[in-house]
Amino acid sequence: ARCSMLNSPEYNLDQSDTYKAIDEFQLFMNHYPESGLVDSCNTLISSLRSKLETKSFEKAKLYYKMEKYRSAVILFNTTLEEFPDTDFKEEVLYLIIRSNFLFASNSIQTKKEERFDNTIKSYYTFVDQFDSSKFLKSAESYFKSSKKELDKLRNVN
C-alpha cells in the first residue's frame, strides 16, 4: 500500500496508483482492524482522497475554461457527489451558477427558459449554504440577470 502511495503522482496525472493505494490501505485495515497503524492508514487515505478531490475540481474547471458549460456543470456536480465535504464546495456551487448562466445565454431560444431556471435553482442552492460568500455579489448578479431574461422570455410567449 505504501509503495502504491509513493507511486501516486501529482493530481493532474493519471491517478491509478492513488486508487490502488486507497484500496490497499483499506484492505489492510479490514484485515487488521486492531492494528496500531489504522490511524495512520486513515490519515494517508484522507491525503490521497484530497488529491482525487483536487483532480475532480480542476477537471471541471478545465471544461468551464474551454466554455463547455454543460459538461462543466455535470463535472462540478460529480465533484460534489463524490466529495460532499470538499474544501472547494463554495467555489464549485458558484461556478455551477456561472456555468448555468453562460450555458443559458448561449442557448437557442427554445431552451433558454429551462436553462435560466436551472441558473436560478443553482443560485438558491448556493445561498442556502453560503449566505455570506465572497462570491455572493456576483452570484446575485447572475440571479437577477436570469430573472430578467425569464421575464422577457415569458412575456414573448
Residue spans for each PLM region:
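Acidic, polar-rich low-complexity tracts and alpha-helical solenoid repeat scaffolds
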Residues: 1-157
